[in-house]
Amino acid sequence: MTLGITHLVHANVVCADFDRSFDFYTRVLGARLIGRVFEFDAAADFQAILDVTGSVRCKAALLTWSDDDAATYLDLLCFADERGEPVPRTAKQPGLARLGLRVRDMTATLARIREHDVPVVAGPVTLTPMPGRHRHVLTIRDPDGTMLNLMEFPELGSGRG
């Protein structure tokens, strides 16, 4: 028996500078804000699910690229201690290695990335993970170094899939 999981709901991206990362994901990558940017006491409000202790403030935003209420969203989080300094993650902590984001048009995507002087890590390259399934992949990094694979799926058209 399976758990009945149907899809990924959201991914958390923890950043060191909220405004810089918010600008990158909205202005450069075209995400839009769901609701509003909010701030809260992470330890008091979400200690169990965020695994934080002590006096830790969190600034957060939910971002999406879709009008579909059931679409996966990005949860952009920035944690700060009582002095307002970012709460660092250690290199020992395993975590998210990269995010894959589907794009409609790789040519337009590459032009936008270049327009905003975002360094390209790799690509675009064409991958064929299985016969008849091609992926054009452009790899960049967000301001904190999280790898992002911007992926075009030509055989699927511009819809979801």
For every predicted segment, state its role.
Residues F38-E39, L77-D81:
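Histidine- and/or cysteine-centered catalytic micro-motif in compact active-site loops
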Residues V14-A70, A108, E115, P131:
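Core segments of cupin and vicinal oxygen chelate
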Residues Q93:
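Flexible, small-/acidic-enriched active-site or ligand-binding loops
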Residues A42-A48, E82-V87, G159:
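A short, acidic/glycine-rich surface segment
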Residues I5-T6, A31:
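Short glycine-aromatic motifs
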Residues M1-G4, V13, R36, L74, ...:
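Vicinal oxygen chelate
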Residues L96-R98:
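Eukaryotic phosphotyrosine signaling hubs
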